[in-house]
């Protein structure tokens, strides 16, 4: 076990150009931290404080940089993976809370899932940030994956308890294919392109009612109920 932070570790992503793992700690405070973990040394080798309240999982671009959704700030930023210098910042109309990212490298498209009163998926040029398409999606999306083999997007919703499949007709045109039922609270997802399997973790929970002091209390998860549901092609 390697100590990283006190709490609220959000995700860990391997960055191939540096050979390091970037670990996200989004604390919902005024600042969040990106940690650099060196697998060869098996230790944390760097920590970078950002003036961001909540950082969702980053997306490695593949050119030595990575995209970072900033949900509370309403932005998508791109950083250098070696220096952590800010390279780009994009804001999209009708996207108040960007929460999940995926990409189509072949057709140079960035997919941005946006939370809000009218949730949407933004399809943007991966180099310029220009919006190419937009379509409505389910609520509170926390993960998106692009299946290059079938040219399909996979979009889970833990609130609506489903997995939406969206077909890519061409780089800028998309259509919903189907909605597959999942478990409540199955927000997060891992997609294995080799086996074409989708993995959705979830737990049983109790949702406390809102109070005068807390409009949206955190759910209370039940012990020994963690599961991973697997979907095949």
What are these regions, as identified by a protein language model?
Residues 1-233:
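Predominantly soluble domains enriched in secretory-pathway, periplasmic, or organellar proteins
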